[in-house]
Design a protein with these regions (language model features):
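Conserved ABC ATPase signature
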Residues: 139-143, 147
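Conserved ABC ATPase "signature" region
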Residues: 106, 117-135
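Catalytic Walker B motif of ABC-type/P-loop ATPase nucleotide-binding domains
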Residues: 164-168
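Hydrophobic anchor residue at the start of the ABC signature
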Residues: 153
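Q-loop/switch helix immediately C-terminal to the Walker
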Residues: 89, 97-111
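ABC-family nucleotide-binding domains
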Residues: 174
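ABC ATPase NBD Q-loop/coupling interface
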Residues: 63-78
Length: 225
């Protein structure tokens, strides 16, 4: 599903050495990439989400593919049905044009021009997975940080992506909510044949739910297990 072979990325105007990645994973399930603040986790997450070159300018060399398509070949808007990225700041990922959580979750599927029956099925299933059913009629602006993170993850799940990137997407959740969501997401990925890639600073509890993991250090990836 994701392949990076001696893949080098040098951001525009960067004075640092280029990032150099070797990564290959094709099975459904959940894997993790760990790294300290400033290690380049978000940059790699955005590369894997297909943000280059639209929102991630710079130069790339060597081989990189996402779901079989070379990085940079498919416009970001065309990738939204198959690749989703959830980042650390949930408030920045709300559409800003809906008046309820239910409308927010429906926003993505509606933009795919899906049938109404399919949209309704998705806005039932995604909030159920993330424990957002009691929030369905709340205005997004009234949600707490943890509630907003669960809603944003539900929005991504409602798109039914083959590749879901979660960049510190659990930072505002309680430990209990984090464990619950990891367990459900792991099951969802295996059931649907999708791949979830977690980007986190700390290994606990995430490593317990992952089939494989890497450490991002010195602008490169090192296998952990």
């Amino acid at each position: 599903m994701v392949t990076l072979e001696q893949f080098r990325y040098c951001p525009t105007h960067s004075t640092h050495p280029p990032f150099c990645y070797d990564f290959h994973y094709v099975k459904p399930g959940m894997v993790a990439i760990f790294g300290d603040n400033g290690s380049g986790k978000s940059t790699l997450a955005q590369l894997m989400a297909g943000w280059y070159p639209d929102f991630l300018p710079g130069e790339i060399t060597c081989t990189g593919t996402l779901l079989g398509t070379p990085i940079g070949r498919l416009p970001l808007n065309e990738q939204s049905a198959t690749i989703q990225l959830v980042q650390q700041s949930p408030y920045l990922q709300l559409s800003g044009c809906t008046f309820s959580v239910e409308e927010e979750v429906a926003f993505g599927p509606e933009n795919l021009c899906l049938a109404e029956k399919e949209i309704m099925a998705r806005i039932d299933a995604a909030p159920a997975l993330t424990e957002c059913q009691p929030l369905r009629h709340r205005h997004p602006a009234t949600l707490s940080g943890g509630e907003t993170q669960r809603v944003v993850i539900a929005c991504a799940i409602a798109m039914q992506p083959k590749l879901l990137i979660l960049d510190e997407a659990f930072s505002r959740l309680t430990p209990q909510a984090c464990e619950m969501l990891l367990q459900r997401l792991q099951h969802w990925a295996l059931e649907r044949g999708s791949l979830i890639i977690l980007f986190e600073r700390h290994r606990t509890p995430f490593l317990n739910y992952c089939q494989q993991a890497w450490q991002l250090q010195n602008r490169a990836l090192k296998p952990l297990c």
